[in-house]
Amino acid sequence: MSSVTFLGTGGGRMVVLNQLRKSGGFWLKLDNVNILQDPGPGSLVMVHQLRLKPRDLDAIMLSHMHIDHSNDVNVVTEAMTGGGFHPRVRLIVPADCMNSDPVVLQYIRPFVGITEIKKGMEITLGEVKIGFPIQTMHPVETYGIIYSFKEGRLGYIPDTEYFPELAGAYRGVDFLIINVVRMKTDKRIRHLNMDEAAKLIGEIHPKRAILTHFGLQVLKADPELQAKNISEKTGVDVMAAHDGMSVNFEKKENHEWF
């Protein structure tokens, strides 16, 4: 059964630096393929606390290089390759994670096969197809992702400011994970706010959406209440993630998710 497990749901400097929520990204198990998405600070600690096994990972994926999404990429790479003695896995990252201001250490690179993300590309891991339909609007090179697997299609909207083309890139997904750092827009900080997230969810209209990557404003406003409000507004099943939460992606015959 495919699933997502949240190794952290915190976003933004105040939440991450003070660990008001954990910040380890999320672990996807899709058709028996295991992928760690955006391993921020404390990711490896949460992996072990939740009794997941780094050696089970098939890939690490970075949406972008910022520290709350990439801090643990090197130590998790060490863990999933047995210190480099079992170099069988893949690291999938934007080019600037390797080049301009690299977050992947040189000595780690021979341990893994490295794929540099480009807009519009598609790759396959086992039976899982992974597409990168859009480059988002963020201060560094950042890509949205769609995972296609047996139970459906999962879209991930990482850090970005709102722009009109965003919703169209995700239309047709069954399931959506969306980073929502703020309640109100600050143009200096290129992140989605809650109203923009609600608009995207309404336009994309997945069967279920999960909010995560909460900044301090969102925590004060109660993420669960915000998810309920968006559900009522859009008719979509919306939930707020919490640290350690797992959700199964199983489709019933009537095509509902639970």
PLM region descriptions:
Residues P41-G42, D96-C97, T136-P139, D159-F163:
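Short beta->alpha connector loops
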Residues Y162-M245:
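Cap/insert and terminal regions of metallo-dependent hydrolase folds
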Residues N71-M80, V104, L219-K228:
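Metal-dependent catalytic neighborhoods of phosphoester/phosphodiester hydrolases
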Residues L36-G40, D58-D68, P94, G155-T160, ...:
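Active-site neighborhood of phospho(di)ester-bond hydrolases with catalytic His/Asp-centered motifs
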Residues H86-T142, F149-E151, E250, W257:
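Metallo-beta-lactamase
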Residues A240-F258:
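Binuclear metal-dependent phosphoesterase catalytic core
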Residues G42-I92, D174-F175:
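Active-site metal-binding motif and surrounding structural segment of the metallo-beta-lactamase
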Residues M1-L50, T142-P158, F175:
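Conserved beta-strand hairpin/beta-sheet module of binuclear metal-dependent hydrolase folds
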